[in-house]
UniProtKB/Swiss-Prot annotation:
Quaternary state and interactors: Part of the Bam complex, which is composed of the outer membrane protein BamA, and four lipoproteins BamB, BamC, BamD and BamE.
PANTHER family in the cross-refs: OUTER MEMBRANE PROTEIN ASSEMBLY FACTOR BAMA (PTHR12815:SF23), SORTING AND ASSEMBLY MACHINERY SAMM50 PROTEIN FAMILY MEMBER (PTHR12815)
Protein's name according to its UniProt entry: Outer membrane protein assembly factor BamA
Keyword Repeat (UniProt): yes
Stated role: Part of the outer membrane protein assembly complex, which is involved in assembly and insertion of beta-barrel proteins into the outer membrane. Constitutes, with BamD, the core component of the assembly machinery.
Length: 803
């Protein structure tokens, strides 16, 4: 066998054997050690081919090329006569990747980072990359204050040159901030400055934002907060000189020292605007007016820049540049602000596109647009389209993106990116509700029927006290101008006694149709007609019912029927930021009806609902919600409003913590009534001449309900589901009264039901979930102000409705 000459042993250890300037001609190339890599693939990666004349430099280039493929741990090139013998050791293939001990970082996030570094199942393992990954993960833990954390990559060999890769984490504990010192502050105390930080050395129990756990990113944010605090108060020369973060020997404590130079306070002497103002100098000048002697304020300067950009954006200048340069005069402690504006090009909208609307048709989204294709771009019109899409309630999120058209200097496309949510459900089953007992439900409710935007409902319910069925349809764009048309037909068999109301049975059916007329972006008027037939039976005489029957001329009736035609009207103001789980804005809804000639009854009824959401943070995760509900009705022409049209309160949609419909006036049964008027629910005759007091609610013709709610982020819920779950703490209050009540007509121990001051109150916590079955609402409330006859119900839940 001819002697083999070693040309190069490996990447790190090489011996350069010189074959002369002319080298030798390669007659053949052989490989040893290939397992996963094909011979053809290896040959293609080499710069040397059979028949080439090679020298030392060619051999070095060959080795580098083979290493560059990432498939080999070791490469040796040997010469056997005119044959090149390439000996390789392939890198092992990753068979599996597992993690152990990682609590702060999820597996999915780790896998994404590994894949970004080329480490994935089925790929070759580069051991040098593992060292970088270990160090990068440890640096991450250090940045969040876990200085004792360690990450080790454990590689376990398997047959056929495969390995298992396991990352073992020892996270340790987060270092806590022992003290934060600010050096150089004279105008403000250290306590005042630190009170605006997220990081704290002391955290009161009530502070849900402050944190003693050190995090590098939070410190950077706090330093920016400190800078803004001074700049907003005129300290134009303020500077953070240095920041020291010291670690205790046991790596469990942190000391932070921030060295600052406050400088003096400066006042604005004027604002000078220059540049390409695109003919809008007068409007821009209004945005830059300042009060004489006003302190320099960095936040106001930034807002002024943003306002100028928004102004130009409304006129089609999609990418304006606004830069403010303060000229500081140290002699008189003033700042002159020079604002340079470059409006840039004005843009047309070529196309409006929608992404993510797999169910909703483009036409449903497009009719909500206020920005038109082929027109000048208007940023305010684009934003209005986003608001209108959010208010539809079809989408979890709506985002906009203005994209330049390649090759065009003055055209853009506006893209609305939506994430659809479940807008309805098909259900058939048996359920249980705290207010309805065992119930059987079947139906379809779809707010975006087949993606057309139609709202269609086919529903049926049967429970302890009610059999109800309804078909409803609403076309929100009956005309191209946005006039809506809705209608429904229904049937209801209602056993009032089983619903904790006074004794009667009402079988009713009816229909109504309503037109909605948009007045502007936020206001809609509604008008319509309705018909309802009510057939009452099993009426046990009680005072409120008796008043109504007397006004109808049939005081002794135990059965009664009425056909009524109504004119229905309403007004809605809606400026909520989205249709479900809103976080900002207000909504006011006024509804009413009045009987028209041809009706057996003569009455009117009005109700008003309001809701206002006020976010208290920039991310709208913490929100204060205030709600009210008012109702009033009365008879006309000497008749009373029917008792079955009364208002009720109590339950998950009004005052939580009280049983449904139990707040307010109670039935006082007349002598001879056969009912469960006493507390043990045994049916017997009322024998008291003045009447028998009961706990059966009868409602009233007037109602007032209010609620104050604090919406918070839901614990243990990932960002993916944050828009589907809502947690809140609430305080509810409400009352129902009867303005026509005559205390002299009832026993002396019966309260005055005409008094609106009998207010009930409760407080508790609520959880709402937009589930695939529809909205699920859970609440736990404790009544802390109630009256005799009220029925408490701390835990309540409902399917399919929110307030």
């Amino acid at each position: 066998m001819a002697m083999k000459k070693l040309l190069i042993a490996s990447l790190l250890f090489s011996s350069a054997t010189v074959y002369g300037a002319e080298g030798f001609v390669v007659k053949d190339i052989h490989f040893e050690g290939l397992q996963r890599v094909a011979v053809g693939a290896a040959l293609l990666s080499m710069p040397v081919r059979t028949g080439d004349t090679v020298n030392d430099e060619d051999i070095s280039n060959t080795i580098r090329a083979l290493f560059a493929t990432g498939n080999f741990e070791d490469v040796r090139v040997l010469r056997d006569g005119n044959t090149l013998l390439v000996q390789v050791k392939e890198r092992p293939t990753i068979a599996s990747i597992t993690f152990s001990g990682n609590k702060s970082v999820k597996d999915d996030m780790l896998k994404q980072n590994l894949e970004a570094s080329g480490v994935r199942v089925g790929e070759s393992l580069d051991r040098t990359t593992l060292s970088d990954i270990e160090k990068g993960l440890e640096d991450f833990y250090y940045s969040v204050g876990k200085y004792s954390a360690s990450v080790k990559a454990v590689v376990t060999p398997l047959p056929r040159n495969r390995v298992d890769l396991k990352l073992v984490f020892q996270e340790g504990v987060s270092a806590k901030i022992q003290q934060i010192n600010i050096v150089g502050n004279h105008a403000f105390s250290t306590e005042e400055l630190i009170s605006h930080f997220q990081l704290r050395d002391e955290v009161p129990w009530w502070n849900v934002v402050g944190d003693r756990k050190y995090q590098k990113q939070k410190l950077a944010g706090d330093l920016e907060t400190l800078r803004s605090y001074y700049l907003d108060r005129g300290y134009a020369r303020f500077n953070i000189d240095s920041t020291q973060v010291s670690l205790t020997p046991d790596k469990k404590g942190i000391y932070i020292t921030v060295n600052i130079t406050e400088g003096d306070q400066y006042k604005l002497s004027g604002v000078q605007v220059s540049g390409n103002l695109a003919g809008h100098s007068a409007e821009i000048e209004k945005l830059t007016k300042i009060e004489p002697g006003e302190l320099y304020n960095g936040t106001k300067v930034t807002k002024m820049e943003d306002d100028i950009k928004k102004l130009l954006g409304r006129y089609g200048y999609a990418y304006p540049r606004v830069q403010s340069q303060p000229e500081i005069n140290d002699a008189d402690k003033t700042v002159k602000l020079r604002v340079n504006v470059d409006a840039g090009n004005r843009f047309y909208v070529r196309k409006i596109r929608f992404e993510g609307n797999d169910t909703s048709k483009d036409s449903v989204l497009r009719r909500e647009m206020r920005q038109m294709e082929g027109a000048w771009l208007g940023s305010d019109l684009v934003d209005q389209g986003k608001e209108r899409l959010n208010r539809l309630g079809f989408f979890e999120t709506v985002d906009t993106d203005t994209q330049r058209v390649p090759g065009s200097p003055d055209q853009v496309d506006v893209v609305y990116k939506v994430k659809e949510r479940n807008t309805g459900s098909f259900n058939f089953g048996i359920g249980y509700g705290t207010e309805s007992g065992v119930s059987f439900q079947a139906g379809v409710q779809q707010d975006n029927w087949l993606g057309t935007g139609y709202s269609v409902g086919i529903n049926g319910t049967k429970n302890d006290y009610q059999t109800y069925s309804e078909l409803s349809v609403t076309n929100p764009y009956f005309t191209v101008d946005g006039v809506s048309l809705g209608g429904r037909i229904f049937y209801n068999d209602f056993e009032a006694d089983d619903a904790d109301l006074s004794d009667y049975t009402n079988k009713s059916y009816g229909t109504d149709v309503t037109l909605g007329f948009p007045i502007n972006e936020y206001n809609t008027l509604r008008a319509g007609l309705g018909y309802v037939h009510n057939k009452l039976s099993n009426m046990q005489p009680q005072i409120a019912m008796d008043r109504y029957l007397e006004s109808m001329g049939d005081p002794d009736a135990s059965d009664f029927a009425a056909d009524d035609f109504t004119f229905n009207y309403g007004w809605t103001y809606n400026k909520l930021d989205r249709g479900y789980f809103p976080t900002d804005g207000s909504r006011v809804n006024l509804t009413g009806k009045v009987t028209i000639p041809g009706s057996d009854n003569e009455y009117y009824k009005v109700s008003l609902d309001t809701a206002t959401y006020v976010p208290i943070d920039n991310d709208h995760k913490w929100v204060v919600l205030g709600r009210t509900r008012w109702g009033y009705g009365d008879g006309l022409g000497g008749k009373e409003m029917p008792f079955y049209e009364n208002f009720y309160a109590g339950g998950s949609s009004t005052v939580r913590g009280f049983q449904s419909n139990t707040i307010g006036p109670k039935a006082v049964y007349k002598n001879g009534a056969h009912t469960s008027w006493d507390d043990d629910d045994d049916y017997e005759d009322c024998t008291q001449e003045s009447g028998c007091k009961s706990d059966d609610a009868v409602g009233g013709n007037a109602m007032a309900v209010a609620s104050l709610e604090f919406i918070t982020p839901t614990p243990f819920i990932s960002e993916k589901y944050a828009n589907s779950v809502r947690t809140s703490f609430f305080w509810d209050m409400g009352t129902v009264w009867d303005t026509n009540w005559d205390p002299s007509s009832a026993p002396s121990d019966v309260p005055d039901y005409s008094d609106p001051g009998n207010i009930r109150m409760s407080a508790g916590i609520a959880l709402q979930w937009m589930s695939p079955l529809g909205p699920l609402v859970f609440s736990y409330a404790q009544p802390f102000k109630k009256y005799d006859g009220d029925k408490a119900e701390q835990f309540q839940f409902n399917i399919g409705k929110t307030w």
